[in-house]
A protein has these predicted regions:
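N-terminal accessory regions of nucleic-acid-interacting proteins
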Residues: 1-10, 14-56, 60, 83-106, ...
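Proline-rich intrinsically disordered, low-complexity coils
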Residues: 2, 7, 40, 65, ...
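Generic intrinsically disordered, low-complexity segments enriched for polar/acidic and small residues
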Residues: 6, 13, 35, 104-107, ...
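Solvent-exposed, well-ordered amphipathic alpha-helical segments
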Residues: 47-52, 75-78, 154
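Metal-dependent phosphoesterase core characteristic of DEDDh/y 3'-5' exonuclease domains
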Residues: 81, 92-98, 131-219
Length: 219
């Protein structure tokens, strides 16, 4: 599946190159274990071109695996990303109990706002997206222990959880520091006016802005 430039990443990508964070091959060092080469608690964080910021939102019901509803990612090697909300069909709903549906409605109303059957791409596209991201990236960067576990089951890649870094602000605090323009939101959440706390595109924009600000700021 082709990816394309996200408007929400434009000014961040421009600043990424303008401030010389990546300036030729001398700034890129390959490591066998990217986890050991990335210190999220350091004042100056080295950014390598094979990292990918990623976030997911979805539905949970009982002990069922999470049904991923939305995925957003930004690949530092290409400065390109995408945001997709998946469309479930009757097959995904046929085994859901009344109790399951109650939980699904709770997620829609109080968590991410996305109705169960709404979507922009068929859920079958998820496997293609996983293969594309996996082929292009060496490490995934996200925030949240539970999310890191879920991503670890989907991808055969190291996962860096910025939530483990001491002093990493909450998304609400990040949104205060980095005001959210409309193009930071996916189209769905922009219309709903509910970017936080559960728009995947907004969250990776905020994480990327936060990491870049720590690199640009004085050591």
């Amino acid at each position: 599946m082709p990816t394309f430039d996200l408007p929400g990443f434009g000014h961040v990508a421009d600043r990424f190159w303008r401030d010389g964070i990546v300036n030729g091959a001398e700034t890129i060092t390959q490591h066998d274990d990217c986890r050991s080469s990335f210190d999220p608690t350091a004042r100056v964080i080295k950014l390598y071109l094979n990292y990918c910021f990623i976030d997911i939102e979805g539905f949970r019901a009982g002990k069922r695996p999470m049904l991923i509803k939305e995925i957003a990612w930004f690949n530092l090697s290409t400065l390109r990303g995408d945001n997709i909300i998946f469309r479930f069909n009757s097959e995904h709903a046929k085994d859901l109990t009344p109790s399951d549906w109650k939980q699904m409605k709770y997620f829609t109303k109080f968590i991410h706002g996305m109705p169960f059957f709404y979507g922009t791409q068929d859920y079958s596209c998820l496997s293609i997206i996983i293969r594309v991201i996996q082929s292009q990236c060496q490490c995934l960067i996200t925030k949240g222990a539970e999310k890191a576990v879920i991503l670890g089951k989907l991808f055969n890649l190291p996962i860096i959880d910025l939530g483990e870094a001491e002093g990493t602000p909450s998304y609400f605090k990040l949104a205060t520091k980095f005001p959210i323009p409309d193009n930071f939101w996916c189209d769905f959440h922009k219309k709903q006016k509910t970017a936080l706390p559960h728009c995947a595109m907004t969250k990776i924009n905020l994480l990327l802005s936060y990491v870049l600000s720590r690199n640009i700021s004085k050591p």
